[in-house]
Amino acid sequence: MADKALHTPPPSTLRNNSYPGPPPATPKLPSRRALLEGGNRGNPTRPPPRPLKPREYDYDEDDEKENQGPGQEKPPAKEEEEEEEEEERPNWDLHHLLQKWGADIDKLKDKVCRDLDSYKQKLGIRL
């Protein structure tokens, strides 16, 4: 039995690794300062890259005329009317938005006044 113990290799060499001895130590965690400062990731003086803008394609409707049958073309007068409507629409949208904001501000003002009146009542302040 003593002969068998002398001929058995140490347990570290029985594993499937190419080096004898204990396994390597676990790597150390980065310091707290390195984690807070971002470590070595990129150059801290450069801002992150901006996202790409979506490409705007200019489609020419005239290119598609060969795919239209006779009588499907719009008369030029309608195109001019549509352009005029598009020019007037932003003014209408702006006017509508300003009216909505005005109504929202009035509602907020009324709510703040009601809240302040209720605080005065709770505190027993009467003027």
Swiss-Prot record:
Residues 1-94 are annotated as: Disordered. Disulfide bonds: none annotated. It is found in: Host cytoplasm; Host nucleus. It comes from the Viruses. Keywords: Early protein, Host cytoplasm, Host G2/M cell cycle arrest by virus, Host nucleus, Host-virus interaction, Modulation of host cell cycle by virus, Phosphoprotein. GO terms for biological process: symbiont-mediated arrest of host cell cycle during G2/M transition. Coiled coil: none annotated. One of its GO terms (cellular component) is host cell cytoplasm. Residues 79-88 have a biased composition (Acidic residues). Phosphorylated by host ERK. The phosphorylation triggers a structural change that enhances keratin binding and protein stability. Contributes to multiple aspects of the viral life cycle including viral genome amplification, suppression of suprabasal cell differentiation and egress of newly formed virions. Induces host cell cycle arrest at the G2 phase by associating with and preventing the nuclear entry of host CDK1/cyclin B1 complexes. Inhibits cellular DNA replication by preventing loading of host replication licensing proteins MCM2 and MCM7 onto chromatin. Within the cytoplasm, associates with host kinase SRPK1, a splicing factor regulator, and inhibits its activity. Belongs to the papillomaviridae E4 protein family. Assembles into oligomeric complexes. Interacts with host CDK1. Interacts with host SRPK1; this interaction may favor expression of late viral transcripts. Interacts with host cytokeratin components KRT8 and KRT18. The major E4 form is first synthesized as an E1^E4 fusion protein from spliced E1^E4 transcripts, such that the first few amino acids of the E4 protein are derived from the N terminus of E1. This is Protein E4. It comes from Human papillomavirus 4. The lineage of its organism: Viruses, Monodnaviria, Shotokuvirae, Cossaviricota, Papovaviricetes. The gene is E4.
